Swiss-Prot record:
UniProt name for this protein: Uncharacterized protein C2H8.05c
Residue numbers carrying Phosphoserine: S68
Biased composition (Polar residues): 59-76, 148-157, 199-217
Residues carrying Phosphothreonine: T92
Length: 217
């Protein structure tokens, strides 16, 4: 009865006396960690067999814990993948939209700069042409003795009025470009125009819809 009650215990303690331990051979020591080949009915008090019985439940419990680890279901895994893919697509669309907006802003700034420079050059050319024509007209009027004085005064008054307007326009233009150490001419305008045309042609080859309005203009 005592043996059966001891066998039901989950862990069995066993001891080897110091004298017996000294007398044990290396083979006997190695058999402490091997399952006994003898039957438990014939050798109930075999410490080697009891050691194996004590270690066996621990191995089984370890296997059970390993096999009982939670595994995510396939539906949740697919849902997470879809969410990640949707997030990546939204970020891609957002970044592409920002790139298109930035490209449109750059094109608008380049076009505005070309327009301003073109208007500035046209104003300067027109002013120079007016001054030159007035000087030539004034010289011709001074050399021509047959011209009446009233006509001469009328032309001079008109010339002074136009010159005053041109002078005010030139002063306004100088105020706009005050502090700048450079000036624009036809060559600068042509260079900017080439840059704009090259950019538009490259965007058109790429099929960008942003250049349709600018190309149509």
């Amino acid at each position: 009865m005592q043996d059966s009650s001891k066998n039901k215990q989950p862990c069995v303690s066993w001891k080897v006396s110091p004298l017996k331990a000294k007398a044990m051979s290396p083979d006997d020591v190695s058999r402490l960690f091997c399952k006994s080949s003898t039957s438990s009915a014939t050798r109930k008090h075999d410490p080697f067999h009891k050691l194996w019985d004590r270690l066996q439940p621990k191995a089984q419990s370890t296997i059970q814990r390993t096999s009982s680890l939670p595994v995510p279901s396939s539906s949740n895994f697919k849902e997470r993948l879809n969410n990640i893919g949707g997030l990546k697509r939204s970020r891609t669309l957002e970044s592409s939209y920002e790139d298109e907006t930035e490209t449109a802003n750059k094109l608008s700034r380049v076009s505005s700069l070309v327009s301003v420079i073109r208007q500035t050059i046209d104003r300067k050319k027109s002013l120079e042409r007016r001054v030159r024509e007035e000087q030539e007209e004034k010289t011709d009027n001074e050399d021509d003795n047959d011209v009446e004085i009233s006509t001469q005064e009328s032309l001079e008054n008109n010339g002074l009025a136009e010159k005053k307007d041109d002078t005010s326009s030139l002063a306004t233009l100088e105020d706009d470009i005050e502090g700048q150490e450079f000036s624009f001419d036809d060559q600068d305008l042509q260079m900017l125009q080439d840059i704009e045309d090259q950019w538009l042609s490259s965007q058109k080859q790429q099929g960008s819809p942003l250049t349709s309005d600018h190309i149509s203009k």
